[in-house]
Amino acid sequence: MAARNGGTIIDGKAFASGVRGRVASAVAGLEAAHGVVPGLAVVLVGEDPASQVYVRNKGIQTREAGMASFEHKLPAETAQAELMALIERLNADPAVHGILVQLPLPRHMDAEAVINAIDPKKDVDGFHVLNVGLLGTGQKAMVPCTPLGCLMLLRDTLGDLSGLNAVVVGRSNIVGKPMAQLLLNESCTVTIAHSRTRDLAGLCRTADILVAAVGRPRMIRGDWIKPGATVIDVGINRIEEAGRSRLVGDVDFDSAAPVAGAITPVPGGVGPMTIACLLANTLTACCRANGLPEPDFAEAGG
């Protein structure tokens, strides 16, 4: 973490590097002791430029961690039945421990049906309805990567989270809802806010933990934040400013940082944690598939 006048900047990039290092060490130990190599299959349908970048980065980091990387790139016009057949083959492949279908999918495909075709034990994104239900009932589940990364940063920053008031701004199935569930499982008092929430600013000011995942650039300002609160900014928004393109979060960092006790920047905060947690989930899936002890990455940063 880096100190700043008024608060601490949570260095997600450094923490993610620590997670990846722990994963790589565990993978090497797994191969040496048991001859097992975790395998991650990533499926990309279409030519979306952002998705291509994400898939390329995932492949690089998977291989750097010592895992097997299987990339399947399909044209945008691929029939859904063909994609389902590929998923069925990956489900049955013992060398593949994690399956990720890059979203968004082309419009003619039913994303929910595709995700739920993945074997829940290989669903390293944590989006399968079974994993959602397991998480919601406090049982062992594959946890979505971005909320898991946020939770790791919060634990590292605050230690015990029990009894803290947490406000999650955003109710998506990918971030908002699972984030709220993870915080509830940590014994926080959790409120989910969204675009219809009355007096959103006032609600945010009650939060000891404020998670912004609404997809609106710089929506949350410094005067919305309780002094000393920990702010986790999940937003990644590209804006044009002074003739240049730049990335900003859902939080107005310049006004929020002097008020917050700790805050994640954009970029360099939550973003790097997502792929690190994907690798951790893949390793976990491999250990479960082989009846081996699961590593604990709760305090893997630094």
UniProtKB/Swiss-Prot annotation:
One of its GO terms (biological process) is tetrahydrofolate interconversion. NADP(+) binds at G170, R171, S172, S195, I236. It catalyses: (6R)-5,10-methylene-5,6,7,8-tetrahydrofolate + NADP(+) = (6R)-5,10-methenyltetrahydrofolate + NADPH; (6R)-5,10-methenyltetrahydrofolate + H2O = (6R)-10-formyltetrahydrofolate + H(+). GO terms for molecular function: methenyltetrahydrofolate cyclohydrolase activity; methylenetetrahydrofolate dehydrogenase (NADP+) activity. The keyword Oxidoreductase applies. Catalyzes the oxidation of 5,10-methylenetetrahydrofolate to 5,10-methenyltetrahydrofolate and then the hydrolysis of 5,10-methenyltetrahydrofolate to 10-formyltetrahydrofolate. HAMAP family: THF_DHG_CYH. This is Bifunctional protein FolD 2. The lineage of its organism: Bacteria, Pseudomonadati, Pseudomonadota, Alphaproteobacteria, Rhodobacterales.
